[in-house]
Regions:
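Alpha-helical bundle segments enriched in helix-capping/polar residues
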Residues: 1-253
Length: 253
């Protein structure tokens, strides 16, 4: 009897072992628009035969992929987020503010040590900077929440990318997948780890003592959000390739 491609008890249901929404969507696309070129078919078969022998790799890939319960909109949301304009980094006032505040504080401390001005002047300026930082708290908190959600997705993907980076590849398709995620000097997983580090540093603003001290010295949270926006600008063009690499590896596994 005929076997349906999609739906209950379908071909897709029987062969689908993907662990990400990216891989599931790609596998469905492959079944819906099958290859007709002989060389392309043989090339994909070669990649599948190679992965069939790598049981540990496939099992670890699946386990890591299932740690995050993704949704169908993840890919579009990540790409839209990567293309979204920077709020603080594009504004010269915000870029200069941490430098100006830091410079003024250093100057005041130096003058106070030299006995030219009383130390209370530094204390008053520091308090002014702390209160001024409250003007940006709401906007930065909203951005922190958005970036945190994206990082949750990217952190899972970083583990999958690291597996791909460390796995020896022989077939042309698998080698191409490796090329999509960077070279030894700058890997995709390392780049995402850098974002994770920046986000962890920004999370220190939840500590009231650190928040007041560092913002009073050089508007620390603005400096951090500018660095995070810089990361997004630097890797926005790379993100679609990373997602494509994960999707292909997941569908092939």
């Amino acid at each position: 009897y005929d076997l349906d491609v999609f739906g209950p008890h379908s071909l897709f249901q029987y062969i689908n072992r993907t662990c990400t929404q990216l891989g599931k969507s790609l596998l469905a696309n492959w079944l819906g628009t099958h290859l007709e070129n002989k060389k392309e078919i043989e090339s994909r078969q070669e990649a599948i035969r190679e992965l069939a022998l790598e049981l540990n790799f496939r099992q670890e890939f699946r386990i890591l992929g299932l740690l995050y319960k993704g949704k169908a909109a993840d890919e579009d949301e990540l790409k839209a987020w990567a293309k979204s304009p920077s709020v603080f980094r594009k504004n010269i006032f915000f870029r200069m503010l941490p430098l100006l505040a830091g410079g003024i504080n250093i100057l005041c401390i130096a003058l106070a040590i030299a006995g030219i001005i009383p130390l209370t002047v530094f204390g008053i300026l520091w308090l002014c900077f702390v209160f001024a930082s409250f003007c940006f708290t709401s906007k930065i908190t909203k951005m922190q929440a958005v970036y945190g959600k994206k990082l949750q997705i990217l952190a899972t993907y970083a583990n999958l990318l690291r597996l791909i980076e460390n796995q020896p590849m022989k077939s042309p398709i698998l080698k191409e997948v490796r090329e999509w995620i960077g070279d030894e000097k700058q890997t995709a997983s390392h780049s995402i780890q850098r974002l994770s580090k920046l986000m962890n540093e920004l999370d220190q603003r939840n500590n009231a003592y650190i928040y007041a001290t560092l913002n009073g010295l050089f508007f620390w949270e603005i400096r951090k959000i500018i660095q995070i926006e810089g990361w997004k600008e630097q890797y926005a063009s790379e993100l679609p390739r990373w997602l494509t690499a994960i999707a292909h590896m997941d569908a092939l596994c």
